[in-house]
Amino acid sequence: MIKKQLKVINKTGLHARPASELVLKAKKFESKATIRNLDQDKEAVNAKSVVRIMAEGLKQGTRIEIAADGSDEENAVEELCALVESGFGE
């Protein structure tokens, strides 16, 4: 399992569009991918579920952890984190 911590940087947080982008990217990988809200010390949720991600209420500045476990875990974490760090183009 590979994990990386980072912050949500886009002004509007992970609302419907960025959550959907994250899910589409996560679904390209065979590995199980999760996202966890570190500020509220919540359990990790499935990064392949828009509903689960949006339910976390991830706003700008929220510390999160992206993790993946499986055959392509390294690439999954790298690409998912790059997407979050890009601010989803916002």
Predicted feature residues:
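C-terminal structural segments of small proteins and small subunits
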Residues: 55-90
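Intrinsic-disorder/low-complexity, polar/charged segments enriched in Ser/Thr/Lys/Arg/Asp/Glu/Gln
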Residues: 1-5, 63
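A composition-driven signal for long, intrinsically disordered, charge-rich low-complexity tracts
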Residues: 1, 30, 88-90
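Charge-rich, low-complexity amphipathic helices
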Residues: 1, 44-48, 75-76, 80
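Compact, glycine-rich, soluble single-domain proteins
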Residues: 7-60
